[in-house]
Amino acid sequence: TYLELAKELHGEQPVIEANPPPARRETIVVIDFGSQYSMLIARCIRECHVYCELISHDVPWEKIASLNPKGFILSGGPFSVYDPGAPLPLPYVYESHLPVLGICYGMQAIVRQLGGEVISGTKHEYGHAILHISGLECPLFAELPSSLPVWMSHG
């Protein structure tokens, strides 16, 4: 929250409840599509003092609802969205009207499901790169610089 951020900036450590009851806990749900980095994504979220759960892409809403989700992160994976039987996010991801962040395959799945086209790049993407962010007005990216070094692993 903004209050916790302000306290951190002024040297006061916010009180973080280690394991609040599920009814009060706000959860980011990381939906795993088979990425080798899914557990790393979840760990990084937790290191930011945000509770998250890593779940398989086929977990039904009935099991998700009890987690009190506040947003979804769709992981990467080894698939192409054009592969027959490629896993896609279940409808609740969109029907919930919660924020969704797609990473790699997760973003491709969003684009495909919402009627967009995913095309192959002209070269393999592996190694250090510079990410240029457009949309800094979005709260998710507001405190980031307009460009930053990243690691890519597509190929």
Residue ranges and their predicted role:
Residues R25-I28, H128:
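Short, solvent-exposed beta-strand edge segments and adjacent coil->beta transition regions
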Residues M39, R43-H49, S66-E143, S147-P149:
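Cysteine-nucleophile active-site neighborhood
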Residues T1-R25:
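Flexible inter-domain linker/hinge segments
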Residues S153-G155:
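Short, intrinsically disordered, charge-balanced linker/junction segments flanking boundaries
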Residues T27-I31, P99:
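Conserved beta-strand elements of the Class I
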Residues H49-A65:
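A short, well-structured beta->alpha microelement
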